[in-house]
Structure formats: structure tokens, C-alpha cells
């Protein structure tokens, strides 16, 4: 059975970091694709060891904050 999860990818220095907020897993890679593939593997391994109950997907939104330039 396949489940759909969210991946958030951002760059930190010379690496890309990928996170799955539903599960709490994270991984990294030298490219976006590598980080994403590593996250898929890490999440799959995690879920084999710690199966999760059905849950709602997190709300992903944006917000604005005043910043002094």
C-alpha cells in the first residue's frame, strides 16, 4: 500500500535538506533529487519500524511578519 506524504526541501550551505512533517523524518543530499530520494528511503524505513495510525494531513499555509530592513 502506498501513502502520500509531504516533503519540504530547503538548502543549507551546500546541501539540500528534505523533511516529512507528517512523520518527522528528515534527510539530506547534494541535490534536491538526492535529498528527496533519501527522505523517501528514510521515511519508508521508519514506517516499517514504527507504523502510524491514520491521521489528518497538516495544514500548510503562509504568514507575514514585519521585518525592519
Residue ranges and their predicted role:
Residues 18, 34-39:
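N-terminal start-of-chain detector that recognizes signal peptides
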Residues 17, 26, 64:
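Short aromatic/hydrophobic contact patches that present stacked aromatics
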Residues 3, 8-22:
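Short aromatic-glycine-(Arg/Gly/Cys) micro-motifs in beta-strand/loop hairpins
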Residues 1-8, 37-69:
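Short, charged, surface-exposed hinge/linker loops at domain edges
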Residues 23-32:
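A short, exposed loop/beta-hairpin motif centered on an aromatic-Gly-Thr core
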